[in-house]
Amino acid sequence: GIIRALEENNIPFDYITGTSMGAIIGSLYAMGYSPDDMEALLRSEDFKRWYSGKVEPKYAYYFKKSIPTPEFFNIRFDFKDSLNVKPQLPTSMVNPIQMNLVFVELFARATAACDGDFDRLFVPFRCIASDVYNKRQIVLGKGDLGDAVRASMSFPFVFKPIEIDSVLAYDGGIYNNFPTDVMRDDFHPDIIIGSVVAANPSKPKENDLMSQIENMVMQKTDYSIPDSVGILMTFKYDDVNLLDFDRLQELHDIGYNRTLSLMDSIKGRIHRRVNADNVRLRRLVYRSNLPQLYFQKIYIDGANSQQQ
């Protein structure tokens, strides 16, 4: 909603940084998606399946399907060698297989076009991931765009982390949930418009697993922008979580209307304008020049010859 309102008022976007959900939205815009394109994707049934990990029935092997149960997860033991029983808990709530495949489809063409340099996207872009072993943020501005976004949104226990440059990368919000410092250090913009849709973890609740995990892993973030640096828009959502994509329209409208209410102030700080038709044309040219996605080789790991 914020992006749509700014575009409609000819406010230019020169750089984008984002963490977690901000990395998803920011990366889509950075690789040439319009607000309409992003809304169509996020509203689609396909997207709901990707972030929930559900498999379409036509792709399920019915003879291997388990009997439906209300269980949250289960643990299986193999007593063939009772001295080496090693029970394993699930690594994530959401099965990552569909999301991993879809991120290749979504981001591979833009990665190829920019040759792994996020400064060469339609809009230069950075996102943040977390190295929990070394207790530090990772600023991602090069490499595979899909992997960067996938890492930035990998909140512990919800989504499985991925490995980037031999580092297990988690959600960037653990150490930096509002990367205005990265925006300043990497891009040196004249004005920053910051959108805050999160807050530092509140006191954990006895029956709320997510609030307990947040308090265990997330460091406090400075959600402020000095007036001399930019404009801050803060949204308080007490009952919205990482997977609430069903409330997209509600959240879009809140962001859109709030941005319009601040438009006079924004225009007073940002004097340069861009022509909407010119932006659409540049976006069309950029998207049309993206290479086609072809799979030349497929490597299968962890399977025997019969399984392959």
What are these regions (language model features)?
Residues 1-19, 27-308:
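Patatin-like phospholipase
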